[in-house]
A protein has these predicted regions:
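C-terminal accessory segment of soluble enzyme catalytic cores
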Residues: 110-113, 124
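A short, acidic, amphipathic alpha-helical segment used as a generic capping/interface helix at domain edges
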Residues: 55-64, 96-110
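C-terminal helical cap(s) of enzyme catalytic domains, especially alpha/beta-barrels
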Residues: 125-140
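Acidic/histidine-rich catalytic cores of soluble enzymes
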Residues: 1-90
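A short, acidic, flexible beta-alpha connecting loop/helix-capping segment that sits on the rim
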Residues: 79, 117-126
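Conserved active-site loop/cleft motifs that coordinate metal ions or position small ligands
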Residues: 71-74, 113-120
Length: 140
């Protein structure tokens, strides 16, 4: 299976919104072998308001692409805010998305069952082990 990733929309990259991803996917002959990786930083940077309208973003994702076609999540915070088109990952809880968003994500019955790939830099004060423990601690 090939997974297309949601992109932040910097420069001329493809996949900067759900409609572009849907168009690409619709052009693939064997649709059963193509899906989406939802990148949390990229979605915010592309202009999807995950902080204040999580349900609306998920509804739009479902309407345009279909939640069943989302196969994985890149979990990361964003150094920049909504619609910045910057693509600069931040450690969990240290960026613009914040802990309330990640609490919502890891407790969303649809999204929580997907593979989540931590995509942050290890800092001297924060390790991937710390971030994984933080995310697990948010699960109800």
């Amino acid at each position: 299976m090939v997974l297309l990733e949601t992109m932040a929309g910097k420069g001329t990259e493809c996949g900067r919104n759900f409609d572009e991803l849907a168009t690409i996917m619709d052009g693939v002959e064997n649709k059963a072998n193509v899906g989406v990786t939802f990148d949390t930083c990229h979605a915010l940077d592309a202009g999807y308001d995950l902080e204040n309208d999580y349900d609306g973003v998920m509804r739009q994702l479902n309407e345009v692409i279909g939640l069943a076609r989302v196969k994985a999540i890149h979990v990361n915070d964003s150094q920049f805010g909504l619609g910045s088109h910057k693509d600069r990952h931040a450690n969990i809880g240290e960026g613009q998305l914040g802990i309330p968003f990640f609490t919502r994500l890891v407790n969303d019955p649809t999204m929580a069952k997907l593979p989540m790939i931590l995509e942050t830099k290890e800092q001297t004060s924060t390790t991937h082990r710390d971030e994984i423990a933080l995310l697990r601690g948010l699960v109800d």
